[in-house]
Amino acid sequence: MKLKTTLFGNVYQFKDVKEVLAKANELRSGDVLAGVAAASSQERVAAKQVLSEMTVADIRNNPVIAYEDDCVTRLIQDDVNETAYNQIKNWSISELREYVLSDETSVDDIAFTRKGLTSEVVAAVAKICSNADLIYGAKKMPVIKKANTTIGIPGTFSARLQPNDTRDDVQSIAAQIYEGLSFGVGDAVIGVNPVTDDVENLSRVLDTIYGVIDKFNIPTQGCVLAHVTTQIEAIRRGAPGGLIFQSICGSEKGLKEFGVELAMLDEARAVGAEFNRIAGENCLYFETGQGSALSAGANFGADQVTMEARNYGLARHYDPFIVNTVVGFIGPEYLYNDRQIIRAGLEDHFMGKLSGISMGCDCCYTNHADADQNLNENLMILLATAGCNYIMGMPLGDDIMLNYQTTAFHDTATVRQLLNLRPSPEFERWLESMGIMANGRLTKRAGDPSLFF
C-alpha cells in the first residue's frame, strides 16, 4: 500500500489510511476544527491521488476505528457480502469510481457491488468525485422502499411534512399538516420534532397526526421524533405507530452520547414489525449529519465525511424506510458556508445511495451560518436532479421550534413542476381524489388548507 506521492516536485507522505481519507476531503470547517484537514490545496490533491490508487482491500482492512474497539465497525464489516467483496477487492478506488459512473454499469450491477463495500470505501469514492460526479452517480442508483407509500421510484420526489410547534400545540400542528397536504407534501412522512420527550406528550401528538390521517384516509405514515425508547414505550401502550425514529452516529461512543445502543434499534425494528400501521416492510427512520461525531467527541481523529458514511453503513443494517442528512443544521463550525453545505449535501446523498439506503436531505442552515434561503433552493434542485428521495417541508421553511431554516411546502411543488417529478404513486392518487392534483400538476385548489374544513 502506497502512502506517498510526488506533486510539483514536492513529496507528500501520509502516515496511514485515516490521514489520507481526511486530507482528501474538500475543505470544510469541521475538519479544520478537528485538526485533520489538508494544510493546502496541493496537499489535498496529493491525498486524492494517493487515495485514488489505493485498493478496496486497503481501505476495508484499515477502518478508521478498529474492529475490536467499536460496535459500528463490527456491524459494517460483518455485513459485507464476501462474494461481492472478493470480486472488487483488488480494484483501485479510481476504478471503482469509474465503474459507478459508467453507462455500462446497470442498477443491478451496483445493487450487487454495494454489498461488498464498507463505509470507508464508500467515503473514499465520494472524495475523488466532483459535484457533477456525485449528482450523476447518485442518479444511477435509485433505492426504493415501501411503508404505506413507496419512496424512491425514479421520476418521483417526496417530502416530509414537518409541522413543528414551540409548545407542541396540537391545533398548530394540525393546521400546519393541513397546509402541507394542500401543497402535496407529506408522502415521505408527517413527522413532528417534539419539545417535550415523554410518553404522554408523544402519544398526544401521534393521536393528532393519525387523527388527520384517519379522517381523510391518507396513504402515508406519521412519526414523532422523540428518543427511540420513548417511542417504543408509547407504541406498546397503544399510541398509533408509523415510523420509529432515531438520530444515529458513526461510532459506538457517538451512539452512547445520543443515549443509543444497537439493542435499542433492534427492539425498535421488532416493535415496528409487531405494532406499527405500515403496509410495507420498512418502518424505521434515521437522521444523520456531517460533524455529529466530532461534536460528540467521538470521531477518533477521522474526518466528518468518513464518519458520515459510517452512519449509512449502520443504517443499512436496519433497512429503514427513510434516512436523511440534516446537512446544515450543525452550524458553521462544521460546514461554514453555502459552498461547503452544498458539497456536503451532494456527498451525503451519493454515499447514502451507494450504501443502498433510501436517502433524503434536509436542505438547511442555521441563522449564524454564511448562507441564505437561496442555498436551500440551489441544493434542493441539485439533489432532485440527482434523484434524491425526499426533502423537508414546513411553512415558509422557517422552523420556529428548532430555530433553523429549511425548505417550504411550495419548494417541493416547485421542484416537481420544474423537473417533471411526481409524488409517490399512492399519495398522488389521494391528492387527485381531493382535487389537489391532476395529471401530475397542482390544481387551483392547491395551497388552500380550507378544503379540509
From Swiss-Prot:
Keywords: Bacterial microcompartment, Cobalamin, Cobalt, Lyase
Enzyme class label: lyase
Subcellular localization: Bacterial microcompartment
Regulation: Inhibited by 5-adeninylpentylcobalamin (AdePeCbl), a cofactor analog. Irreversibly inhibited during catalysis by cleavage of the Co-C bond of the cobalamin coenzyme. Reactivated by EutA, which probably involves an ATP-dependent cobalamin exchange.
Cofactor: record remark: Binds 1 AdoCbl between the large and small subunits, with 6 cofactors per holoenzyme.
Residue numbers binding adenosylcob(III)alamin: P194, Q246, S295, M401
Cofactor: adenosylcob(III)alamin
Domain of life of the organism encoding this protein: Bacteria
Pathway noted in the entry: Amine and polyamine degradation; ethanolamine degradation
Any Gene Ontology CC annotation: ethanolamine ammonia-lyase complex
Documented EC number(s): 4.3.1.7
Catalytic activity: ethanolamine = acetaldehyde + NH4(+)
Expression triggers: When grown in ethanolamine and adenosylcobalamin (AdoCbl) (at protein level). Note this experiment was done in strain JM109, which expresses the eut operon.
Annotated positions binding substrate: R160, L161, Q162, N193, E287, D362
GO biological process assignments: amino acid metabolic process; ethanolamine catabolic process
Pfam family, one: EutB
GO molecular function: cobalamin binding; ethanolamine ammonia-lyase activity
Function: Catalyzes the deamination of various vicinal amino-alcohols to oxo compounds. Allows this organism to utilize ethanolamine as the sole source of nitrogen and carbon in the presence of external vitamin B12. It is spontaneously inactivated by its substrate and reactivated by EutA.
Quaternary structure (record): The basic unit is a heterodimer which dimerizes to form tetramers. The heterotetramers trimerize; 6 large subunits form a core ring with 6 small subunits projecting outwards.
Family: Belongs to the EutB family.
HAMAP family in the record: EutB
Name used for this protein in its record: Ethanolamine ammonia-lyase large subunit
Originating species: Escherichia coli (strain K12)
Gene field: eutB
